[in-house]
Amino acid sequence: MPLVYHAPALKKRTVLFPRGLTRGRRAGMVKKNTWEVFVMLYPFNALLARMKYITRWSLMHSTRAESLSEHTCDTALLAHTLCLIARRYTGTPCRPKTVAVAALYHDAPEIITGDLPTPVKYHSATLRDAYKAMERESVASMTAMLPDELAEEVAPFLTGELLTAEETKLLKAADRLSALVKCLEEQRSGNHEFDAALAQQKAVLEAMHCPEADWFIAHCLPCYTQNLDELTRQDG
C-alpha cells in the first residue's frame, strides 16, 4: 500500500488526478482549483534498508554481531562466484547475474518475520510449515509496497521462483558458505560457541553434493584464515 505525502507545490514527477480519481489508493493532496496534487510513495526499498538492524545468530554469543545486510551481501557475492565456477569448470547451466540478484532478496522476508533461529525453525514439521506460510505472507505484504508493474518484476526474486533447480541449489550453497565463513571467523577469534555450528555447516554442504561449493572450499575457503598481509602479498 503506498504511503501518503502532502505535496507542498506542483513539481516535476508530481502526478495530477481530478478529484476522486484515486482508484482506491491513498495519496497526499494539495488543493489547486478543481485539481488535487497526488504523490504516491512506495516504502519497499526503505523497508529493505532495515535489514541492517536485524541481527543473525541471535541465540549465540558472537565476538562480532552480523547483520542480515552483511549476510545478504556475502551470499550474493558467493552465489555469483559459484555460478562463474559452474560456467567455467563444472558445466552446470546457470545465469550468474540472475542468481546474484535473487541472493540479494533471499532473506528479505525476515524483515517482517524476523530471523528465527534455525533450531526453532526446523524443530518440527508444524513449525517449519508455519514459518513457510509466514514467509509467503511477508512476500505478499512487501510486494504490495510497490506499484503493480514493479511488484511483478520483483516478486519472482523474492520467492526465488524464477530460478532453475540448478540455480536454486547454487544459491542455497552460497547461503551455507556464508554461514560457514561466519563460523570460521568466530572460531578463529577463540569463540567455541560456534564449533557445533561449524561442523553442521560443513556436513550440510558435503551432503549437498555441489561441485561448485566443493571447488570453492578447496581453492578459496582457506584464504579466509589468512591475515591482511598474507592476502595482499604478491609472491615473486
Language model features by range: what are they?
Residues 30-236:
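Alpha-helical, largely C-terminal catalytic domains
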